[in-house]
A protein has these predicted regions:
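Domain-level signal for soluble alpha/beta catalytic cores
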Residues: 1-119
Length: 119
Protein backbone atom coordinates (compact mmCIF):
# COMPACT_ATOMS: atom_id res chain seq x y z
CA UNK A 1 0.00 0.00 0.00
CA UNK A 2 1.25 3.49 -0.76
CA UNK A 3 0.64 6.61 1.30
CA UNK A 4 -1.77 7.71 -1.42
CA UNK A 5 -3.69 4.44 -0.92
CA UNK A 6 -3.69 5.04 2.83
CA UNK A 7 -5.11 8.53 2.39
CA UNK A 8 -7.78 7.19 0.05
CA UNK A 9 -8.77 4.53 2.59
CA UNK A 10 -9.06 7.16 5.29
CA UNK A 11 -10.94 9.59 3.04
CA UNK A 12 -13.47 6.91 2.08
CA UNK A 13 -13.98 5.76 5.66
CA UNK A 14 -12.34 2.37 5.25
CA UNK A 15 -10.87 0.76 8.32
CA UNK A 16 -7.11 1.19 8.62
CA UNK A 17 -5.37 -0.82 11.31
CA UNK A 18 -2.33 0.58 13.08
CA UNK A 19 -0.14 -1.39 15.41
CA UNK A 20 -0.55 -0.99 19.15
CA UNK A 21 1.82 0.21 21.81
CA UNK A 22 5.27 -1.23 21.32
CA UNK A 23 6.24 -0.14 24.83
CA UNK A 24 3.26 -2.03 26.24
CA UNK A 25 4.30 -5.16 24.38
CA UNK A 26 7.88 -4.81 25.60
CA UNK A 27 6.53 -4.64 29.17
CA UNK A 28 4.30 -7.65 28.54
CA UNK A 29 7.43 -9.60 27.60
CA UNK A 30 9.03 -8.68 30.94
CA UNK A 31 11.32 -5.84 29.84
CA UNK A 32 11.29 -2.16 30.68
CA UNK A 33 10.09 0.12 27.88
CA UNK A 34 12.52 2.87 28.93
CA UNK A 35 15.51 1.01 27.55
CA UNK A 36 13.78 0.48 24.17
CA UNK A 37 15.60 -2.85 23.87
CA UNK A 38 16.85 -1.85 20.42
CA UNK A 39 20.41 -2.92 21.16
CA UNK A 40 19.87 -5.46 23.94
CA UNK A 41 16.91 -7.33 22.46
CA UNK A 42 16.50 -6.49 18.77
CA UNK A 43 14.71 -9.81 18.17
CA UNK A 44 12.07 -8.71 20.69
CA UNK A 45 11.33 -5.57 18.66
CA UNK A 46 11.34 -7.57 15.43
CA UNK A 47 8.89 -10.14 16.82
CA UNK A 48 6.55 -7.44 18.14
CA UNK A 49 6.43 -5.83 14.70
CA UNK A 50 5.83 -9.22 13.08
CA UNK A 51 3.02 -9.97 15.53
CA UNK A 52 1.26 -6.71 14.66
CA UNK A 53 1.67 -7.33 10.94
CA UNK A 54 0.38 -10.89 11.31
CA UNK A 55 -2.60 -9.53 13.25
CA UNK A 56 -3.52 -7.39 10.25
CA UNK A 57 -1.88 -4.01 10.81
CA UNK A 58 -1.74 -1.85 7.69
CA UNK A 59 0.68 0.57 9.38
CA UNK A 60 3.39 -0.15 11.94
CA UNK A 61 5.21 2.43 14.00
CA UNK A 62 8.85 2.44 15.00
CA UNK A 63 10.06 2.02 18.54
CA UNK A 64 11.41 5.56 18.80
CA UNK A 65 9.49 6.92 21.79
CA UNK A 66 11.74 9.36 23.67
CA UNK A 67 14.65 8.82 21.28
CA UNK A 68 15.89 12.38 21.15
CA UNK A 69 18.75 14.40 22.55
CA UNK A 70 16.29 16.50 24.52
CA UNK A 71 14.68 13.53 26.23
CA UNK A 72 18.08 12.05 27.07
CA UNK A 73 19.18 15.41 28.51
CA UNK A 74 15.98 15.55 30.55
CA UNK A 75 16.45 12.00 31.83
CA UNK A 76 20.14 12.16 32.70
CA UNK A 77 21.67 14.84 34.90
CA UNK A 78 24.89 15.06 32.89
CA UNK A 79 27.25 13.26 30.52
CA UNK A 80 28.89 11.77 33.59
CA UNK A 81 25.53 10.41 34.75
CA UNK A 82 25.06 8.74 31.35
CA UNK A 83 28.52 7.20 31.62
CA UNK A 84 27.79 5.92 35.14
CA UNK A 85 24.61 4.28 33.83
CA UNK A 86 26.57 2.54 31.08
CA UNK A 87 25.29 4.69 28.22
CA UNK A 88 28.14 7.11 27.63
CA UNK A 89 27.62 9.45 24.68
CA UNK A 90 24.00 8.40 24.31
CA UNK A 91 23.03 11.81 22.94
CA UNK A 92 25.46 11.24 20.07
CA UNK A 93 23.75 7.96 19.16
CA UNK A 94 20.21 9.25 18.57
CA UNK A 95 20.45 8.94 14.78
CA UNK A 96 21.88 5.43 15.03
CA UNK A 97 19.10 4.31 17.40
CA UNK A 98 16.34 5.80 15.25
CA UNK A 99 17.84 4.13 12.18
CA UNK A 100 18.03 0.79 14.01
CA UNK A 101 14.38 1.10 14.98
CA UNK A 102 13.24 1.81 11.43
CA UNK A 103 15.40 -1.04 10.13
CA UNK A 104 13.81 -3.50 12.57
CA UNK A 105 10.33 -2.51 11.40
CA UNK A 106 11.40 -2.89 7.77
CA UNK A 107 13.01 -6.26 8.51
CA UNK A 108 9.72 -7.46 10.01
CA UNK A 109 7.85 -6.49 6.84
CA UNK A 110 10.40 -8.23 4.65
CA UNK A 111 10.46 -11.37 6.81
CA UNK A 112 6.72 -11.74 6.29
CA UNK A 113 6.77 -10.69 2.64
CA UNK A 114 4.55 -7.72 3.50
CA UNK A 115 6.07 -4.70 1.81
CA UNK A 116 2.51 -3.37 1.54
CA UNK A 117 2.57 -2.54 5.27
CA UNK A 118 3.53 1.09 5.83
CA UNK A 119 6.02 2.26 8.42
Amino acid sequence: MSYTDLKQKIDTGEVVLLDGGIGTEILRHGYTWASHQLKNEPKLNLEIHKDYISAGAHVITTNTFQLSRRSFRNHFASDEHMALQGVANLTDRVGELVNDSVQLADNARKALGRDDVLI
